[in-house]
């Protein structure tokens, strides 16, 4: 199915029924909605502090992005690679219990509260969400947090889906207790709703591990990464099967803030 720009006008804070929103290969679509502000029902114990500093998040993102860029990968469709590799970095260098998760994801990204980035399928009732091999997103879950290392590329993801809108390059890592109750509860930029799909995660992980090219690239990221404040090499030498040496340059994509 081709990407859709989902338009809806809500009544009493609810999303009108419409065509389910899907995007092949996990690419996003943007749907517009007007949602009445809601009182937060989250626990007062929710943690507002990030799990890792912005500098560390940015470095993890840059390493993975640079390696994928060097092999001309389809980066907008690489959320699972980002998540698997970032989880391994968090395990190895930060001793965190991190793991990749696939499923449906919804992020409110517009200041006026009128647009949400959607990965997966939204049902006619405006509440039920589903995900599958052709409509999903992936993120990292770690010690009660959700971290999305593709968040700095949300604008590129929208462009690839046919919705060129300006989106700031920002870090996404949130205490899961801060997650909205459902899609309709998204009220301000940075609000999110995630629906994990364990079966899909297992399938994607099995497929990932079966592809040596992917596991080699992921391992390359782990070998290149240096945890701050250690100095990070600006490039990495690679020797091909024919003995030719090429160099991967570290992309200097800057993250401007946080969701």
Q: What residue ranges belong to the model's regions?
A:
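Cationic, low-complexity basic patches in intrinsically disordered or flexible, solvent-exposed regions
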Residues: 3, 8, 17, 23
């Amino acid at each position: 199915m081709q990407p859709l720009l989902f338009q809806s006008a809500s009544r009493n804070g609810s999303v009108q029924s419409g065509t389910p929103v899907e995007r092949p290969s996990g690419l996003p679509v943007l749907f517009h909605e007007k949602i009445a502000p809601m009182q937060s029902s989250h626990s007062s114990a929710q943690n507002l502090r990030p799990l890792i500093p912005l500098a560390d998040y940015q470095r993890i993102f840059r390493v993975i992005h640079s390696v994928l860029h060097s092999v001309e990968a389809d980066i907008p469709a690489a959320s699972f690679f980002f998540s698997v590799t970032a989880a391994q970095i968090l395990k190895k260098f930060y001793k965190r219990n991190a793991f990749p998760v696939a499923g449906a994801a919804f992020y409110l990204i517009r200041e006026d509260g009128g647009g949400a980035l959607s990965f997966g399928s939204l049902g006619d009732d405006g509440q039920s969400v589903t995900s599958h091999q052709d409509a999903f997103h992936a993120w990292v879950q770690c010690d009660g947090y959700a971290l999305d290392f593709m968040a700095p590329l949300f604008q590129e993801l929208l462009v690839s889906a046919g919705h060129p809108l300006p989106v700031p390059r920002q870090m996404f890592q949130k205490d899961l207790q801060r997650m909205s109750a459902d899609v309709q509860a998204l009220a301000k930029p940075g609000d999110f709703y995630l629906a994990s799909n364990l079966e899909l995660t297992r399938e994607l992980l099995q497929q990932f591990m079966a592809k040596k090219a992917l596991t080699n690239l992921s391992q390359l990221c782990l070998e290149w990464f240096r945890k701050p404040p250690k100095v990070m090499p600006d490039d990495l030498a690679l020797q091909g099967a024919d003995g030719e040496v090429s160099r991967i340059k570290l992309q200097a994509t800057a993250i401007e803030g946080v969701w």
